[in-house]
Amino acid sequence: LRRQRQMCIRDSLYTHWNLDGASVLAAQCLDVQPGHAVLDLCAAPGGKSITLAQKLWPELYADHPSRTSTTHASILHSNEVDPARLRRLHANLKSYLPNTLMDQGLVEISRIDATSPRAVQLFPLGEKGYDRILLDAPCSSERHILHAYMRAQQSGTAAPEMLAWKPTMSRSMSKTQLALLRTAWAALRPGGRLVYATCSLSEQENDHVVRAFLTSTPEAHVLRTDSLVHFCQQTEYGYFALPDYMIPGTEQRSPWGPLYFCMLEKP
C-alpha cells in the first residue's frame, strides 16, 4: 500500500497507511473474521493492528466512524512493551480508528512484557482467550538495515539502524522470539491461528525459532497454502517475502519485504 495518507476532514481520521505489502499479506494470513478476539502481541507502530481492525469491523469507514455493528463482539488487543513505541502505537490507533471502538472497550492497548512466564495471565482475555494472534516479533531488523543503507547512499551519512546493528544480534534475539512465541501459544484458543513474523533475513530468527518451538510443542500444526508461492519463497516452516523474489511464471520481481512469516494452528 503506497498511497499518501489522507485525513477525512469531517471526522479527523486518517484513511491510508503506507504499509509494505508483505506486512499486509502476513496479517491477511491470520484469516480474521468479524466476531474474533484478536491479539497483536508486538503491535507498534500500529499498521498491522489497523489492518486487523479492518477485518474485524469491515462496516466501519473513516467517514462513517459511528456505525459499529452490535451483531458481533469483535475484540482487538494491541500490546507493546517499549514505552516510546507504545506512545506511537496509541497515537496511531487514535488517528485511524473511530473513538467508539476504544470507548466501548472493543480495542484495548496494553503494555505487557510478553517474554515473562506470567505474561499470559496479564492479557485482558488471559490464557486460551484469543482466536487469532499476530506476533510480529522484534528482530535484528535487516529489513530496516537495507532501507537505512539506501537512505545512507542518498544522504552520504550512516543511519542509526546501521550503527546499532551487530552480527551477534540474531543469537540473542532468537531467545526473545522463542519466549514470545510460547506466550502467544498459551494465549491462543484451541482451533485458533497464530502468525509468527519477523523482518530478519537470518534463519536463526525464523525457521530456527519455529523449529525449536515445535520441538517442545509437537501438537502445533504448521499451515500451508499453495497460493503464497505466487508472492513468497517457501521455507521449511513458513514463507519469505523478498524484494528480489521472481514471481513464478513471470519476469517480474516481488516489490515486497523482506518479511518472514509462519502460520500455526492449535488443535
Task: Walk through the language-model features, giving the residues of each.
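Single conserved hydrophobic/aromatic residue that forms the stacking wall/gate
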Residues: 1-9
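Conserved class I S-adenosyl-L-methionine
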Residues: 35-44
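Conserved SAM-dependent methyltransferase scaffold
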Residues: 49-53
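S-adenosyl-L-methionine
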Residues: 79-127
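Mobile active-site "lid"/loop adjacent to the S-adenosyl-L-methionine
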Residues: 128-183, 201-204, 216, 227
